[in-house]
């Protein structure tokens, strides 16, 4: 099978596969991310706001709060979520596996660094980037490379940093950039070092079959269905659960969140659990700071809220060993506590 795949990869007509993939990437990101964010940057510069907090006005009834939040959330992310699933499936059938192994498949730091660099144009939230990371893992991309790509999308999003500078101040944006870069590279490197690949994750996947056993559309259909079924249903359920719990996770009462270590830890942990659209951490923190939240808890929340979430961790349960996901979530929370704790000292 290896020899057959290699001969197919060398066939001259195979160039259309990566070309088609990058065409979909560019067109999709332009429509979903790049063009809308270009206009939003001017809005942020003129008004020092990018909208209302998605957490505002939670209903007292948990079931109604869950439905309300799910409606607002999915209206904001559905285009990016669809694009994420499409790209996560296409990467399994259009990009030669040996390309991925030469770049992102290495367990050395180079793979982690490249995963971070490749994440920058994506600008996706953690849940929309999760299907792409899952597709990469199905092609045997290293844990470090896939984790760096997954976390780098929301944490190092260039558009979010620009919005943050105009809305919260460039000091916040600089801290997020520097601390975020360290967090992404360090966590991905440590997880790669401390967690061993499972035999299941190292084995070839079912959809990686020779052309003779299926054409492009049949193989893409199988990849798309497998990826959708393993990520989207639990994604929807987890968003509903967190929508019901948002009023307890993020208190908005005046003076409720003061500038103390207790609230730094609380906001760091809550940020790791909750799920938000891209850049939604900015109006959330802006609203909570106007209600009296201190700078230290705000920084902790800015670090952890976009980085991971309970739904995205669940979505990747079949792509990474459980230990890798637990470590990632825990180290993101610790990173938020460290950044917030340093703010208390200075």
List each model region and its residues:
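Transmembrane helical segments that form the transport core of multi-pass membrane transport proteins
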Residues: 55-56, 67, 84, 90, ...
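Membrane-helix interface motif
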Residues: 33-43, 245-248
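Membrane-interfacial helix-loop connectors
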Residues: 119-177, 250-324
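Intrinsically disordered, low-complexity non-transmembrane regions of multi-pass membrane transporters
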Residues: 1-23, 39-61, 196-223
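Alpha-helical transmembrane segments of multipass membrane proteins
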Residues: 88, 92, 183-191, 242, ...
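Hydrophobic alpha-helical segments of integral membrane proteins
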Residues: 46, 50, 59-74, 100-104, ...
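Juxtamembrane and boundary regions of transmembrane helices in multi-pass small-molecule transporters
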Residues: 13-39, 106, 111, 168-211, ...
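Alpha-helical transmembrane segments in multi-pass membrane proteins
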Residues: 76, 80, 84, 88, ...
């Amino acid at each position: 099978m290896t020899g057959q795949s290699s001969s197919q990869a060398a066939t001259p007509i195979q160039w259309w596969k990566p070309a088609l993939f990058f065409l979909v990437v560019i067109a999709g990101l332009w429509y979903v991310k790049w063009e809308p964010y270009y206009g939003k940057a001017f809005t942020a510069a003129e008004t020092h706001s990018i909208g209302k907090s998605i957490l505002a006005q939670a209903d007292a009834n948990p079931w109604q709060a869950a439905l309300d939040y799910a409606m607002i959330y999915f209206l904001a992310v559905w285009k990016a979520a669809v694009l994420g699933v499409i790209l996560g499936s296409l990467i399994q059938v259009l990009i030669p596996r040996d390309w991925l192994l030469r770049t992102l498949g290495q367990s050395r730091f180079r793979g982690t660094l490249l995963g971070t660099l490749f994440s920058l144009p994506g600008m996706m939230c953690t849940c929309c980037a999760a299907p792409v990371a899952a597709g990469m893992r199905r092609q045997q991309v290293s844990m470090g490379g896939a984790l760096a790509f997954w976390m780098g999308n929301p944490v190092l999003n260039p558009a979010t940093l620009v919005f943050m500078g105009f809305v919260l101040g460039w000091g916040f944006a600089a801290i997020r950039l520097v601390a975020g870069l360290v967090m992404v590279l360090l966590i991905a490197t440590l997880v790669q070092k401390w967690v061993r690949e499972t035999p299941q994750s190292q084995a070839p996947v079912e959809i990686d079959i020779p052309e003779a056993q299926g054409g492009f559309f049949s193989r893409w259909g199988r990849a798309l269905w497998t990826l959708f079924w393993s990520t989207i249903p639990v994604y929807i359920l987890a968003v509903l659960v967190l929508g019901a719990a948002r009023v307890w996770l993020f208190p908005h009462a005046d003076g409720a969140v003061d500038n103390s270590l207790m609230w730094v830890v609380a906001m760091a942990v809550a940020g790791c659990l909750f799920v938000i659209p891209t850049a939604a951490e900015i109006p959330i923190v802006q609203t909570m700071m106007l209600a009296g939240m201190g700078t230290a808890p705000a920084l902790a929340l800015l670090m952890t809220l976009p980085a991971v979430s309970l739904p995205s961790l669940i979505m990747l349960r079949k792509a990474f060993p459980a230990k890798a996901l637990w470590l990632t979530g825990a180290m993101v929370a610790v990173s938020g506590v460290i950044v917030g704790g340093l703010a208390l000292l200075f």
